[in-house]
Amino acid sequence: DFWVGPFYVGFFGVTAAFFIMLGTALIIWGAALGPTWNIWQISIAPPDLSYGLGLAPLAKGGLWQIITVCAIGAFGSWALREVEISRKLGIGLHVPAAFSVAIFAYVTLEVIRPLLMGAWGNGFPYGIMSHLDWVSNTGYAYLNFEYNPMHMVAVTLFFTTTLALALHGSLVLAAINPPAGETVKFAEHEDTFFRDFIGYSIGTLGIHRLGLFLALGAGFASATCILLSGPFWTQGWPSWWGWWLHLPIWQFGGH
């Protein structure tokens, strides 16, 4: 039951700190081995595809492998620390469960997908510009990644999450900051506003549940969209939609 001032640490807080410090030190080491100290250009690359699923020398991808283990250890420790805090507070495990979806997305990118494709080199590098290049190159490898159906679902859910919670947040700000001479508004006014605005109000508790559902759905769909690309679909994503062109409705009344 270890605390630092008002902050609960616990066993998993200690393990999280260990993995964070070790991983950070290895990143600095990798940067020292590289050609630049420019924060934008520093990159810790995964092993070459020729190494497959084997261990690589430290300077040729081995650092990336150890840093990945440290990252998973840090994320997992932090989630378990959240579990301990939730139990101490007597609340549900919604926060660690939500964080676990983000961990799943990371593990999908760096562990599950490379495993299914047979090489750690299919993971993304650790670096600002290098990881953006990886995203761009991976997208072009499938011609137009926006045609990936799960990518469509993920983007839709991300934007819908933003819209739903922006509507809620802006309404709360409007309700608790009335013009001079007016009283502060409460939940019944908020419900009435949305019933008048869109015909339905999900309620003050419901909007937070909806926001959580949309956000976690976005994270899960984003992990799924990259998992499909490579292990299960190797062509360009536009060609996946060929079935759409052969629906009977397009042949109706034709020759």
From Swiss-Prot:
Membrane topology term: Multi-pass membrane protein
Keywords from the named record: Bacteriochlorophyll, Cell inner membrane, Cell membrane, Chlorophyll, Chromophore, Electron transport, Iron, Magnesium, Membrane, Metal-binding, Photosynthesis, Reaction center, Transmembrane, Transmembrane helix, Transport
Ligand binding (a ubiquinone): F194
GO CC, one annotated term: plasma membrane
MF (Gene Ontology): bacteriochlorophyll binding; electron transporter, transferring electrons within the cyclic electron transport pathway of photosynthesis activity; metal ion binding
Amino acids binding Fe cation: H168, H208
Entry-linked Pfam families: Photo_RC
Location(s), subcellular: Cell inner membrane
UniProt keyword Transmembrane, yes or no: yes
Record-linked InterPro entries: Photo_II_D1/D2_sf, Photo_RC_L, Photo_RC_L/M, Photo_RC_L/M_CS
Transmembrane segments: 11-33, 61-89, 94-116, 149-176, 203-228
Entries under SUPFAM superfamilies matching the protein: Bacterial photosystem II reaction centre, L and M subunits
GO process terms (BP): photosynthetic electron transport in photosystem II
Positions with a binding annotation for (7R,8Z)-bacteriochlorophyll b: H131, H151
Family: Belongs to the reaction center PufL/M/PsbA/D family.
Function: The reaction center is a membrane-bound complex that mediates the initial photochemical event in the electron transfer process of photosynthesis.
NCBIfam families: pufL
Oligomeric form and interacting partners: Reaction center is composed of four bacteriochlorophylls, two bacteriopheophytins, two ubiquinones, one iron, and two highly hydrophobic polypeptide chains (designated L and M).
Protein's UniProt name: Reaction center protein L chain
